[in-house]
Amino acid sequence: MGTKPTEQVSWGLYSGYDEEAYSVGPLPELCYKADVQAFSRAFQPSVSLMVAVLGLAGNGLVLATHLAARRTTRSPTSVHLLQLALADLLLALTLPFAAAGALQGWNLGSTTCRAISGLYSASFHAGFLFLACISADRYVAIARALPAGQRPSTPSRAHLVSVFVWLLSLFLALPALLFSRDGPREGQRRCRLIFPESLTQTVKGASAVAQVVLGFALPLGVMAACYALLGRTLLAARGPERRRALRVVVALVVAFVVLQLPYSLALLLDTADLLAARERSCSSSKRKDLALLVTGGLTLVRCSLNPVLYAFLGLRFRRDLRRLLQGGGCSPKPNPRGRCPRRLRLSSCSAPTETHSLSWDN
């Protein structure tokens, strides 16, 4: 009698874990979650479509600008910014599938479910890991104030780090790649992560811990440490570049605290409950579901804001973007005198040299 009990809600079709996948035992009371499901059906498609449009436009422009610049050498930060834009672009590509699945169910089969789920998970974790890489690059360039030639991170090493980040992200996405499938739920087909019954609770818990520690806690710690050290350095520095660099750091920290930290904490608490096999009351379970939904939506907004926070704030990127929009740009062949043609002189054609300074573009 009444409404049929519904599954535990998590963000999107691919993030979080289905109640059947991570079941730690029945709730102490029969729990009806029709109100949570109704909120999810309205909230998830709206956020997914908004982030998809903004993320595709912003990150697509970042990629186009970086590629159009045609530089033979790039700074480590530029390499990681390019990879961050790629990860966020791939993530944005999966969101229309999430919106459609939330509205009308999943009708693309289990193979597509696994592919889209894996792409979502890999790109989501890669984006967070590349944010940590950029934070470390900025610390080396600004806080330690080393010239480009003396920094431990070089473009070639940055490429190796990028390969490692993508491999780690694929590893973290293995559960989604292997165990996602479509199945009936509440009268509709759903793309969900469902572990086989043969897997023990320990294996499921280990998978969750690996994702939380490697995909969230580690980059979270790196970013927090680097930005704290950067803030201390910039507060003690003098000169006209200090205020601008400090504003950038403050903007990044505020965006991180508002958009990323709540979801990371909610996921940590949810994983702790999973490992402790705690039973929740119905009201507590609903609050947890709503927290994961809302904070998960906030962290997706991050991928559409990254181009503004990490690329558009850079002077070099804005110069490259201006040349791209004006249809200009350097010839791939260097000018014999090392100067720009007269018609492009005002576009600041030559790439700025990395120097010993507080500039955020280093």
UniProtKB/Swiss-Prot annotation:
Q: Which residues lie on this side of the membrane: Cytoplasmic?
A: 70-80, 137-159, 230-247, 313-362
| Spans traversing the lipid bilayer | 49-69, 81-101, 116-136, 160-180, 209-229, 248-268, 292-312
One GO term (biological process):
positive regulation of cytosolic calcium ion concentration
Tissue specificity is:
Expressed at high levels in small intestine, colon, lymph nodes, Peyer patches and at lower levels in thymus, lung and spleen.
Show the GO MF annotations. Answer: C-C chemokine receptor activity; chemokine receptor activity
Where in or outside the cell? Cell membrane
Q: Does the keyword field hold Cell division?
A: no
Function, in words: Receptor for chemokines SCYA27 and SCYA28. Subsequently transduces a signal by increasing the intracellular calcium ions level.
Q: What is this protein called?
A: C-C chemokine receptor type 10
What InterPro entries does the database record attribute to this sequence? CCR1-9-like, Chemokine_CCR10, GPCR_Rhodpsn, GPCR_Rhodpsn_7TM
Q: Which stretches are Extracellular in the membrane topology?
A: 1-48, 102-115, 181-208, 269-291
Which residues are connected by disulfide bridges in this protein? Answer: 113-191
- Give the Pfam families listed for this entry: 7tm_1
Query: Which gene is the coding source of this polypeptide chain?
Result: Ccr10
Indicate the principal place this protein occupies in or around the cell: membrane
Q: Which UniProt keywords apply?
A: Cell membrane, Disulfide bond, G-protein coupled receptor, Membrane, Receptor, Transducer, Transmembrane, Transmembrane helix
Please give the organism: Mus musculus
Q: Which GO terms describe its cellular component?
A: cell surface; endoplasmic reticulum; plasma membrane
What family is reported?
Belongs to the G-protein coupled receptor 1 family.
